[in-house]
């Protein structure tokens, strides 16, 4: 995906700011604008949490277990495991712990609050061989918040992004062993960011609000060689977002000590052109390929696995184009595009999970996973996407209230491991370090079968 910020002077403002790309160190936060997610949820800025039942087994076997409707998202071919007409709704709450300390001892925690990741699915069996499904999910999203006066404010202060995905799918049961599925994703992104902005010798800050629509596609295949063994292969395409927005620049504190936006009074006569600008940003979300397997070892025990590849190597930089670069620099020949460099690599997720059926009403499950971060060079880690490798530990349960209604519950702990430093991208000098990059995920959902 991509996000770009266009800017035009506020009427009557003809003064100029002697700043160039410093104005948009703010783009570190904007990286999330295109699709976004917090590093604590999944590698890069992608959310995995589209199923509470799946959460309990660390998403092993996603889309082909058949115990909820999330096949609509993970692998549409798996809808053939869902008889009749069914409906699902639920949410995962993500609680982050992003404790950071700079070299000078300034501390903060970017965890904003508990962030909901909702899901809603509908499936309908049209005949013996065809199924239709529709899903509404938030596959990308994040929320971080640092105090405005923290030392590394130019690495990002506040960021909140949500991407809503509307995903119709169809599935065809070719025979008893092979099924295929396909769908289209229509996505809406809304993003809000704040970052510190150097303004001459003073300290200012900028705020971006942007939104936009884009679309992509998904495919899935499920192969069942025996009654107890299934494999799935699913693909989700790259999605390119073009988001229009508004950027406001201002001094961090006005004469009264209160943060200001617009054109602060304390800049009069200093040659600063602070105000509101139109903007546009673009960014590409990656291709994703997922391989899953599930085996009914006994009538009570199911074992599942997942391997997921995400093409984050395609996310090399975040280009931001704006006439404001020329206006603020006071140079009509300077570039109107700034690129925030990331130089990511492809990432991988590996998980294993188990389900144990205690009786007709209760199933319990657990899972473990290891996720490889897309951050290839640690000096390109940002405060708003503080990504690192992570370990998954999950537990969950399903309660079948009756033959029509079930409730699913899940809990996961994600532990960030490896390098957690923040660095100067030019010199490589370490500026600070995250003491923690952890998350707790708690989810609940229900599934209702109409017939």
Locations of regions flagged by a protein language model:
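Gram-negative bacterial Sec-dependent N-terminal signal peptides
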Residues: 15-41
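Outer-membrane beta-barrel porins/channels
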Residues: 41-58, 62, 84, 100-107, ...
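N-terminal, post-signal-peptide region of Sec/Tat-exported proteins
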Residues: 67-94
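A generic, lipid-embedded transmembrane alpha helix
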Residues: 96-98
């Amino acid at each position: 995906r991509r996000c770009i910020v266009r800017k035009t002077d506020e009427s009557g403002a003809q003064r100029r700011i002697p700043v160039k790309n410093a104005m948009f160190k703010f783009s570190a936060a904007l990286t999330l604008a295109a699709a976004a997610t917090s590093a604590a949820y999944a590698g890069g800025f992608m959310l995995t949490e589209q199923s509470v039942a799946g959460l309990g087994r660390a998403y092993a076997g996603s889309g082909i277990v058949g115990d909820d409707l999330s096949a609509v998202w993970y692998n549409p071919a798996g809808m053939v495991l869902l008889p009749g007409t069914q409906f699902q709704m639920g949410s995962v709450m993500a609680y982050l712990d992003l404790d950071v300390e700079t070299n000078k001892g300034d501390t903060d925690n970017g965890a904003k609050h508990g962030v909901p990741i909702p899901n809603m699915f509908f499936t309908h069996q049209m005949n013996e061989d065809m199924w239709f499904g529709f899903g509404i999910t938030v596959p990308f999203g994040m929320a971080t918040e640092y105090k405005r006066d923290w030392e590394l404010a130019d690495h990002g202060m506040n960021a909140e992004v949500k991407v809503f995905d509307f995903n119709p799918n169809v599935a065809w049961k070719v025979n008893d062993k092979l099924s295929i599925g396909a769908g289209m994703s229509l996505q809406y992104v809304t993003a809000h960011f704040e970052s510190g902005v150097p303004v001459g010798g003073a300290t200012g800050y900028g705020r971006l609000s942007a939104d936009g629509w884009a679309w992509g596609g998904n495919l899935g295949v499920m192969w069942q060689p025996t009654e107890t063994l299934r494999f799935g292969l699913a693909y989700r395409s790259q999605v390119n977002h073009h988001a229009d927005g508004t950027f406001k620049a201002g001094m961090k504190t006005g004469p009264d000590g209160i943060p200001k936006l617009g054109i602060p009074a304390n800049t009069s006569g200093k040659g600063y052109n602070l105000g509101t600008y139109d903007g546009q940003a673009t960014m590409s979300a990656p291709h994703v390929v997922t391989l899953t397997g599930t085996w009914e070892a006994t009538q009570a025990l199911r074992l599942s696995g997942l391997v997921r590849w995400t093409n984050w190597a395609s996310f090399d930089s975040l280009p931001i184009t704006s006439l404001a670069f020329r206006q603020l620099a006071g140079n009509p020949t300077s570039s109107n595009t700034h690129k925030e460099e990331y130089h990511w690599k492809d990432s991988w997720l590996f998980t294993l999970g188990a389900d144990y059926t205690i009786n007709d009403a209760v199933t319990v499950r657990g899972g473990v996973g290891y996720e490889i971060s897309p951050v290839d060079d640690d000096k390109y880690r940002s405060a708003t996407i503080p990504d690192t490798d992570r370990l998954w530990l999950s537990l969950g349960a399903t309660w079948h209230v009756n033959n029509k209604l079930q409730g699913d519950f899940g809990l996961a702990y994600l532990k960030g491991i490896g390098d957690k430093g923040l660095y100067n991208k030019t010199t490589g000098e370490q500026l600070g370090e995250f003491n923690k990059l952890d998350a707790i995920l708690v989810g609940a959902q229900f599934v209702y079968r109409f017939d």
